[in-house]
Amino acid sequence: MGVLLTQRTLLSLVLALLFPSMASMAAIGSCSKEYRVLLGQLQKQTDLMQDTSRLLDPYIRIQGLDVPKLREHCRERPGAFPSEETLRGLGRRGFLQTLNATLGCVLHRLADLEQRLPKAQDLERSGLNIEDLEKLQMARPNILGLRNNIYCMAQLLDNSDTAEPTKAGRGASQPPTPTPASDAFQRKLEGCRFLHGYHRFMHSVGRVFSKWGESPNRSRRHSPHQALRKGVRRTRPSRKGKRLMTRGQLPR
């Protein structure tokens, strides 16, 4: 019993180091002990956060960027966020660590963006929708809720008897460091690019979660390399000697 208690104590310390701000939040709230319930919550939260109507679109309208030529510049900078391929290549624990670290950087960047947003009274005078500002202000509480569930899932996985080999996460690729801008307009564009990348990242996160198994001991592997090997095994030469046509390829 003493050995088991010591192992659990060490586990709690490790989780607190990996998810420092989440440990206190989980103490206030409660972690679900049901893996499927917790996974379902994570999937719903990521579905919510990849929706551009909740963050990027309101930001574009408030900042006066809702013009086709300006929208073209709202594209994620390459390497700003971890790619889907990188996320799929991680073990589940490494994936959760990377997700948690990246969201921590996102929270800092959102705080910076909020400071540069116009006030509610200024929006009213400009005839803009105050609801857009309210949506932007809800982004940070939503991320905190997601990080709480990430901590709970990490705790649940480490309490299970899963023997999945863990690949170390690379952590956040430091998405959100604002580049020096010469004027306010450039800062608006930087914020727009950041939010575009954030939504893309959350879409990738949702796709990874969708490949997780129905129990903490079973996970449908989300590695693209295994999917490639399966595709090779399923490929059969045509009996009529015709060339195989890959999906999406138009006939000549």
From Swiss-Prot:
It holds the Pfam family LIF_OSM. It comes from the Eukaryota. InterPro entries: 4_helix_cytokine-like_core, Leukemia_IF/oncostatin, Leukemia_IF/oncostatin_CS, OSM. Residues 162-184, 213-252 are annotated as: Disordered. Residues 218-245 have a biased composition (Basic residues). SMART domains: LIF_OSM. Keywords: Cleavage on pair of basic residues, Cytokine, Disulfide bond, Glycoprotein, Growth regulation, Mitogen, Secreted, Signal. Disulfide bonds join C31-C152, C74-C192. One of its GO terms (biological process) is negative regulation of hormone secretion. It is found in: Secreted. The keyword Disulfide bond applies. Propeptide processing is not important for receptor binding activity but may be important growth-inhibitory activity. Growth regulator. Inhibits the proliferation of a number of tumor cell lines. Stimulates proliferation of AIDS-KS cells. It regulates cytokine production, including IL-6, G-CSF and GM-CSF from endothelial cells. Uses both type I OSM receptor (heterodimers composed of LIFR and IL6ST) and type II OSM receptor (heterodimers composed of OSMR and IL6ST). Involved in the maturation of fetal hepatocytes, thereby promoting liver development and regeneration. This is Oncostatin-M. It comes from Homo sapiens. The gene is OSM.
